[in-house]
Amino acid sequence: MWSPIPGTLMRTSSLPAVIEASGNDDWKKRKEAQSLKRLEVKKKRIERRNSLACNTSKEAAGQSPKEMNANTDKLVSSDETIVSANESHSSGKHLVKGLPPKYQATITSEDSSSAMRKKPNSAFKAITEEQNSSSSVPSSGEAISSVTAPSLPLLSLVPITATLGSREDQSILGRAGARANGMGDVERRMMQEMPGVFTKGLSNGSRVEGFLYKYSKGEVRIVCICHGSFLTPSEFVEHAGAGKVDNPLRHIVVSATPNL
């Protein structure tokens, strides 16, 4: 049978006092040895720094004037090489080592743009000279004609003239368009289906324009653009101021261009 556990544990034995004292002494000795090593390391670092500073000062003091002049000449030559490299770099002749040609092109373009920014006066002078040369032209109309006339090739004008037709047809279209703007959709569609006509070869030389409303065998009706009235061919010719004509259809010409 197990005996019950007592409420408090009693200490049966302990280390002797001599052993505890010796352990504390060893720990203190270790700490002292570590601190001494750290101090030695710090002293060595300080001595090295002082020795390097002394050596550099001695070398500077021991140099002769000739050696000092040689060093200054080396510095000046290095500065000159840097300046020449910058000039060649700005002119686009300098190529950076280790870069492909496309990057070389971008570098030269950036250099040229920076050079233009640094020299705005030259660009401004060129602009002022161009303005002065343009101001010496006799008149603005002549200058515009001299500039715009050669800019348009003759071949580009051929299809334009072919599509527009003659000046007479253009005038018919212009007047018909002005009249069509004031009409409704139904009237505009009717006008698009009707060909344009105009008088020609009259004794008085007058010209009247209209639309061919009806052109059946038995009846021909023409709408006058001037007043919008429906007229027969003879009335249309009389409306032009030529009076009565034996054959009025000979003096009425149908336009080839489509109406609006």
From Swiss-Prot:
It comes from Zea mays. One of its GO terms (biological process) is negative regulation of DNA-templated transcription. This is Ninja-family protein 4. Belongs to the Ninja family. Keywords: Nucleus. It is found in: Nucleus. InterPro entries: Ninja_fam, NLS_NINJA_AFP-like, TDBD. Transmembrane segments: none annotated. GO terms for cellular component: nucleus.
